[in-house]
Amino acid sequence: MSLNFLDFEQPIAELEAKIDSLTAVSRQDEKLDINIDEEVHRLREKSVELTRKIFADLGAWQVAQLARHPRRPYTLDYVRLAFDEFDELAGDRAYADDKAIVGGIARLDGRPVMIIGHQKGRETKEKIRRNFGMPAPEGYRKALRLMEMAERFKMPIITFIDTPGAYPGVGAEERGQSEAIARNLREMSRLSVPVICTVIGEGGSGGALAIGVGDKVNMLQYSTYSVISPEGCASILWKSADKAPLAAEAMGIVAPRLKELKLIDSIVQEPLGGAHRNPEAMAASLKAQLLADLADLDLLSEEELLNRRYQRLMSYGYA
């Protein structure tokens, strides 16, 4: 599988290309006099060292590119790798089934949970079918329907956030996009079951918040969370999307800054090079975080859960 190296990863890409070339030569002619295995091992070590060096000092714009990486694991990847017995549930029972949001019942270490998350799609046809992960009102109403079902059956709710934002089309506005988002914010704030939210890629504005109100909010190491994209901010403030790197730094969209502001609880570390380099390891780390969060929330009574969630929401912002 191609790793789809980003611009800032080009030195790594060049090393990996050399490794691939040597490996191919070795396969074609096993009678070569030189020790290719030794050279490949040396280059692999150099690649790991270079990756560590580059990823030790990433800027906000580089993190934003990683959050959008075409090979980055999506909601259904984590469902497959970290959960069992997933049964997808569809439709908002009012208009349609929005494929930009997926949801259903699964088991996390044997425990029934409700999973809800954005799904972007990989290939062109799937991207179009899932509207590039930008939900319409019916997507958020489907999410709310599943949350209410989880509450009735006393199941914890786990959400995965990965969207550039709610769909801004005319049809979505006509069908009540803002109302659907606002209703989700209100209803999620008073659900009587544990709610754990994790930003796994892009956390874009209200489109992310509509499934992002919870008792625990986590972010993967190279995910982002913001009220607008860096390009959108740059276009407004500097009249040019070329200023996106500057906007990304100014907006504080990365996990360490958001944890510093107490907008999130935990940062889930990613494998070296990002989640797309080792989805299985990433899923294992995420699963461990979810289990730890559930164990913590299980200690609370319903009243304590709701009071703590309320206090959390009221603490947002500056005095």
UniProtKB/Swiss-Prot annotation:
Enzyme class name: transferase
Pfam families: ACCA
EC number: 2.1.3.15
Main location class: cytoplasm
Keyword Lipid metabolism: yes
GO MF: acetyl-CoA carboxylase activity; ATP binding; carboxyl- or carbamoyltransferase activity
GO biological process: fatty acid biosynthetic process; malonyl-CoA biosynthetic process
Recorded catalytic activity of this chain's protein: N(6)-carboxybiotinyl-L-lysyl-[protein] + acetyl-CoA = N(6)-biotinyl-L-lysyl-[protein] + malonyl-CoA
Transferase keyword on record: yes
Pathway field: Lipid metabolism; malonyl-CoA biosynthesis; malonyl-CoA from acetyl-CoA: step 1/1
Ranges where the CoA carboxyltransferase C-terminal domain occurs: 35-296
UniProt KW keywords: ATP-binding, Cytoplasm, Fatty acid biosynthesis, Fatty acid metabolism, Lipid biosynthesis, Lipid metabolism, Nucleotide-binding, Transferase
GO CC annotations, alphabetized: acetyl-CoA carboxylase complex
Superkingdom assignment: Bacteria
Compartment list: Cytoplasm
Subunit structure: Acetyl-CoA carboxylase is a heterohexamer composed of biotin carboxyl carrier protein (AccB), biotin carboxylase (AccC) and two subunits each of ACCase subunit alpha (AccA) and ACCase subunit beta (AccD).
Family: Belongs to the AccA family.
Function description: Component of the acetyl coenzyme A carboxylase (ACC) complex. First, biotin carboxylase catalyzes the carboxylation of biotin on its carrier protein (BCCP) and then the CO(2) group is transferred by the carboxyltransferase to acetyl-CoA to form malonyl-CoA.
Protein name: Acetyl-coenzyme A carboxylase carboxyl transferase subunit alpha
Gene: accA
